[in-house]
Amino acid sequence: MKGTSMGVAILAMIVMAQLMVHPSVAITCNDVTGNLTPCLPYLRSGGKPTPACCAGAKKLLGATRTQADRRTACKCAKTAAPQLKVRPDMASSLPGKCGISTSIPINPNVNCNTIP
């Protein structure tokens, strides 16, 4: 009986731990560039984005749930784009090519601090 009570207590603790809300982890520039690395051939030269590129772009969009995350992602992308020789026209067309709907403007002149 003592073993059964201990087992139930442990099981209850495991269930409670799984039900706890885990704090969200803020997005980093490594997350942004890592998710978009498969897109570099498209972002530099055009053509058609690969399935891996679109999957990374969708993953990045899913990771930017908060205003702070969206602004961080914007700032990271703006910093990295010139260094990686990303064409602005290709960057702005990527969401549409991947079937992604976003209200975030994608252009080199966007003020990241105004993104909702």
Curated annotation (Swiss-Prot):
Disulfide bond residue pairs: C29-C76, C39-C53, C54-C98, C74-C112
Reported induction: By salt stress, abscisic acid (ABA) and fungal infection.
Tissue: In germinating seeds, detected in the entire surface of the cotyledons, shoot meristem, inter-cotyledon space, primary xylem and immature vascular elements (at protein level). Expressed in seeds, but not the aerial parts of the plant.
Record GO biological process: defense response to fungus; killing of cells of another organism; lipid transport
Location, primary (coarse class): secreted
Keyword Manganese belongs to the record: no
Keyword vocabulary terms for this entry: Antimicrobial, Disulfide bond, Fungicide, Lipid-binding, Membrane, Plant defense, Secreted, Signal, Transport
Pfam families xrefs: Tryp_alpha_amyl (PF00234)
Cellular localization per UniProt: Secreted, Extracellular space; Membrane
SUPFAM superfamilies xref list: Bifunctional inhibitor/lipid-transfer protein/seed storage 2S albumin
Cellular component annotations (GO), alphabetically ordered: extracellular region; membrane
Signal peptide: 1-26
GO molecular function, one term: lipid binding
Keyword ATP-binding found: no
Cited function: Plant non-specific lipid-transfer proteins transfer phospholipids as well as galactolipids across membranes. May play a role in wax or cutin deposition in the cell walls of expanding epidermal cells and certain secretory tissues. Permeabilizes the membrane of fungal spores, inhibits germination of the spores of the fungus F.solani at a concentration of 40 ug/ml. Inhibits the growth of F.solani with an IC(50) of 6.5 ug/ml, weakly inhibits the growth of the fungus A.alternata. Binds oleoyl-CoA.
Family: Belongs to the plant LTP family.
Name of the protein described by the UniProt record: Non-specific lipid-transfer protein AP10
